[in-house]
Amino acid sequence: MPKSKRDKKVSLTKTAKKGLELKQNLIEELRKCVDTYKYLFIFSVANMRNSKLKDIRNAWKHSRMFFGKNKVMMVALGRSPSDEYKDNLHQVSKKLRGEVGLLFTNRTKEEVDEWFTKYTEMDYARAGNKATFTVNLDPGPLEQFPHSMEPQLRQLGLPTALKKGVVTLLSDYEVCKEGDVLTPEQARVLKLFGYEMAEFKVSIKYMWDAQSGRFQQMGDDLPESAPESEGESEEEDDS
């Protein structure tokens, strides 16, 4: 009798070992960066998008960025004065809560601040985001959509029909009001009609100077109770 695929045993020891190796490698990489670069900046991310963070990594190939795995980063840097890797790094660890990351660089404080202050990218809002403006659709043909899309639009709540093979909005339709917490359906409609409401923004919050060990605040303070970010995006790129 052939064995059922359900009976296949998976070695948890191998999985655990691999996970431990990845964490150890990340710790070593972080400490290597502490030894290599002049400055360490903590940044926060609003409306996280992996693709847009990758664009920043490409623009900052001369530096190193780490995002996600906050607990592992805290182990690498040290949580207290007694176990910190270098002077005052425990102050960095205290701020690793929520959607934050680390930037190691030789660029000056002024250069970093100027670049990230100017950088912003718009994207489509997701369910749970707040609408930043009201969107109303006027009745009439929606020629940007193929006829095969009509049932999907109707399912999303739009009053549509096919008229002579053209998708047509039969009456005025309010997609959302400013301040609404968007539903999945609203977010989908906004994307289909090309309305971008989410601003992807990276804000520099703190700086640590490797030479002096000085830790200083640069932007608004981060909330102490923010949830920890544990599985988001790529930890680092090669420099």
Swiss-Prot record:
GO terms for cellular component: cytoplasm; nucleolus; preribosome, large subunit precursor. The modification Phosphoserine is found at S225, S229, S233. It holds the Pfam family RL10P_insert. It is found in: Nucleus, Nucleolus; Cytoplasm. The keyword Nucleotide-binding does not apply. Residues 221-239 have a biased composition (Acidic residues). GO terms for biological process: nuclear-transcribed mRNA catabolic process; ribosomal large subunit assembly; ribosomal large subunit biogenesis; rRNA processing. PANTHER family: MRNA TURNOVER PROTEIN 4 HOMOLOG, MRNA TURNOVER PROTEIN 4 MRTO4. Component of the ribosome assembly machinery. Nuclear paralog of the ribosomal protein P0, it binds pre-60S subunits at an early stage of assembly in the nucleolus, and is replaced by P0 in cytoplasmic pre-60S subunits and mature 80S ribosomes. Associates with the pre-60S ribosomal particle. Interacts with MINAS-60 (product of an alternative open reading frame of RBM10). Belongs to the universal ribosomal protein uL10 family. This is mRNA turnover protein 4 homolog. The gene is MRTO4.
